[in-house]
Amino acid sequence: MPTLEKTFELKQRGSTVRQEIIAGLTTFLAMVYSVIVVPNMLGAAGFPAESVFIATCLVAGLGSILIGLWANAPMAIGCAISLTAFTAFSLVIGQKVAIPVALGAVFLMGVVFTLISTTGIRAWILRNLPSNIAHGAGIGIGLFLLLIAANGVGLVVSNQAGLPVKLGDFTSFPVMMSLIGLALIIGLEKMKIKGGILWVIIAITIVGLIFDPNVKFGGEIFKMPTFGENSLFLQLDFMGALQPAILPVVFALVMTAVFDATGTIRAVAGQADLLDKDGQIINGGKALTSDSISSLFSGLFGTAPAAVYIESAAGTAAGGKTGITAIVVGVLFLLMLFFQPLAFLVPGYATAPALMYVGLLMLSNVSKLDFDDFVGAMSGLICAVFIVLTANIVTGIMLGFAALVIGRIVSGDIKRLNVGTVIIAIVLVAFYAGGWAI
């Protein structure tokens, strides 16, 4: 296949078509759980699950094919679990934002992220958004995911007196299945079993079919994809997303995307040996832009923001070095469109372990905090803690920025403050002080 070898630089990167196909299948198995988890999470917020399933498959399929063809990168794109949680539980449920407005915010985030990925604005933002705050946001979102998953199965429930939450019914079937599932995922991932998360979801679903009367198989396996009567396709309210109260949400989405995408893409590129002599990502600009364009797809199709999946590392570990890996992933997600009935068979307690596991992985950001910079590290932890305590990502980020600026001034370390950081902090605090934040 000389054309493929030349187009995707197979020989130059030390790979083969067969190796790339195996890598693509490996990545797909590692992240296909998203087409089950994302509709379940957004469905809890009132999104029509059938429409979200199709949109999620389309975003993952088209986004992965785009980054494979354009950036020649072995990275797969899908709806980010952390941003799905933010969209569903913080934005729509917690802050009562209408679903079309939420989709408008997702689309606007995609527009802004695309612009900053193709101009010098991204470099300015990266210079002025402290890494400790970014890592703190990652920790907070991880804790938020853990809380959402634990609450969803009844492990943690609201408390009528005293502290806000308490232990639920520990012996209930959903709780026991979730905890067993989490332990299984951790064990399988330790053993580097490909598709471990998916296999656990399937196993718990089968157990549910046998022992849980609420889980029923309708007899269908294949179904022609249709958005359904309650389709969210092109239902975004872009003008609604431009309201002052919604703009902090867009900022939070953009900030998370900037740091998460850059960190994930760099990590995967490093594993695939796709860094140049200066340590920069080969075709990094195209990869980041592909990532941001995929969030435009999300807003248009009606699902959560997109991002490069860290599970792409499973494929690069299997030998993926070119865009063929990503294209294989994209094609497989498009084929998933025809297996919709199987996705809706999965109970919430089967996907909860996956959410808990992703949340635990995000807590690894603690190791990235620079504790030699005491004020910065504490500001990052303030950001993390208040994201979960307020169930609001933007609030945590605002408090983190405010603590950083005030802490620098009080400690006499004002020289470490960038003008841009101060501007961002003032804008965020003003949004809250003015009552415009949601």
Swiss-Prot record:
Compartments where located: Cell membrane
Pfam families hit by this protein: Xan_ur_permease
UniProt keyword annotation of ATP-binding present: yes
Chief place of localization: membrane
Keyword Repeat: no
Bilayer-crossing regions: 21-41, 51-71, 73-93, 97-117, 137-157, 167-187, 195-215, 238-258, 296-316, 326-346, 347-367, 386-406, 418-438
Leader peptide range in chain numbering: none
Family: Belongs to the nucleobase:cation symporter-2 (NCS2) (TC 2.A.40) family. Azg-like subfamily.
Entry protein name: Putative permease HI_0125
Source organism of this protein record: Haemophilus influenzae (strain ATCC 51907 / DSM 11121 / KW20 / Rd)
Organism lineage string: Bacteria, Pseudomonadati, Pseudomonadota, Gammaproteobacteria, Pasteurellales
